[in-house]
């Protein structure tokens, strides 16, 4: 359910915001257009939002600033601490992951995340989407930004490029986590009663927008 990667975020929490602003050469392309990606998620979101893996709270803050109601979920204590400082003491950040989480107390119309869904295996992604379908009303949306690839060949090419550039952390990251292929994700959503579209924002990251039918 993604919690096997918590140790990564224990060490990354303090420096995460510098990473997303492109200050690390290895991840510069991964986070290119980061602010635009978050703004796009906010623009597509409804009024009552469940957010998974809020990290240091960057997307959460933008959602609140746009007068959305947000139910934030984050499994990392270190990330929750930083996010709390950014969002203020009045915001309750709930301990949970993409599958095991406290349920919102009011009806949500949108589920969002940024750079999170790849922590689940393909089978777990399917189960998560099935669960989210049960939480959303008709026309409710799932809006995820994440690294994903159109083909296995494209995925392997990025690993090769990272290796050739001596981007060891990026290479190992690509090999370690469960970055999805778009045809697989498309099938998962469609089999669970969603229409779905994809938009690419850099060499790695796409926004997937799924609407419950």
Regions found by a protein language model. Name each.
Residues 55-100:
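Class I SAM-dependent methyltransferase SAM/SAH-binding core
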Residues 192-213:
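Core SAM-dependent methyltransferase catalytic element
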Residues 1-44, 46-55:
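Conserved class I S-adenosyl-L-methionine
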Residues 115-119:
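Short catalytic micro-motifs in class I SAM-dependent methyltransferases
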């Amino acid at each position: 359910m993604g919690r096997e990667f918590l140790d990564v975020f224990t060490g990354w929490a303090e420096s995460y915001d510098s990473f997303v602003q492109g200050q690390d050469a290895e991840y510069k392309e991964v986070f290119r257009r980061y602010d635009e990606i978050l703004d796009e998620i906010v623009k597509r979101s409804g009024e009552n939002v469940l957010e998974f893996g809020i990290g240091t709270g960057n997307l959460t803050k933008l959602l609140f600033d746009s007068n959305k109601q947000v139910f934030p979920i984050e499994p990392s204590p270190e990330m929750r601490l930083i996010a709390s400082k950014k969002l203020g003491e009045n915001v309750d950040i709930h301990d949970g992951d993409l599958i095991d989480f406290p349920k919102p107390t009011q009806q949500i119309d949108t589920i969002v995340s940024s750079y999170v869904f790849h922590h689940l295996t393909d089978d777990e992604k399917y189960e998560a989407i099935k669960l989210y379908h049960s939480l959303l009303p008709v026309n409710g949306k799932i809006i995820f930004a994440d690294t994903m690839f159109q083909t296995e060949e494209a995925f392997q090419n990025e690993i090769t490029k990272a290796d050739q550039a001596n981007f060891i952390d990026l290479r190992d990251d690509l090999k370690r986590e469960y970055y999805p292929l778009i045809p697989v994700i498309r099938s998962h959503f469609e089999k669970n009663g969603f229409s779905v579209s994809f938009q690419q924002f850099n060499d790695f990251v796409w926004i997937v927008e799924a609407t419950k039918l």
